[in-house]
Amino acid sequence: MKKLLAMVLALVMTLSLAVSANAAFEDAKDINATYAEAVDVLAGMKVFQGYDNGKTFKPQGDITRAEVAAIVYRIYTADVKDSYVKNYETYNKFSDMAGAGWAKGYIGYCANAALVKGYPNGTFQPSGKVTGYEVLAMILRAVGYDKNNEFTGTDWALHVAQIAEQNKILKNVKGIDLSAPASRELVAELLFQAIQVPTVTYTAAFGYQDVSLTADKKTDKLVKANSSLGYKNFKLVYGDGTDDWGRP
């Protein structure tokens, strides 16, 4: 059984500090116990930053497409201080960015990196609600999927669900309607599981390949290295100080 996850960041953030991020939310008691660890860790990472200057999390509240773009940006770049996001405000190709305000840079970056897609009419709809499948599509692109455009067409949600299921991202959300608008705590759970998944690369000849398998230069044998976004960008490890394969 997997152990409780903790974070080891550049500033040596510990699990107790991560948990305190959750406890600091005035509405922490309203967070579903199943999703509490996800909220703990992502809030501790500053990927989720809460409302009212971090006082509330609003776990059952709907989340917007703009908010998810901001979260995916932080996970993908590790820029949790949003230091560079303004550089991408002009990257937007969508026609409805005039009212996007604070979210322009996040959306611009994610669109430029092909992590988010707009609608056929050329809009992004930043204030629109987002479904569980849409959240999964965004974060799975960050992991490396959709390079073969499998998240396009009428069956895109089915392909998203298949990949998410294969990677055990859905293990705690059985019975949840992922085609409905997603709550903030559900988004936290989906993202938390996804950032533990090995990143992949794609070639037409070989399809998707797990980049955690790398060649040892000394032995020329394949060895495993933790390639997940959580580990690469945030040094996310288990509570006993080991990575995904039990190594210190």
For the regions a protein language model found, what residue spans apply to each?
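Contiguous, function-dense segments enriched for cysteine-driven chemistry
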Residues: 185
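Mature N-terminal segment immediately following signal peptide/propeptide cleavage
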Residues: 39-49
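Feature responds to low-complexity, polar/acidic, surface-exposed segments characteristic
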Residues: 2-36, 49-104, 113-133, 140-181, ...
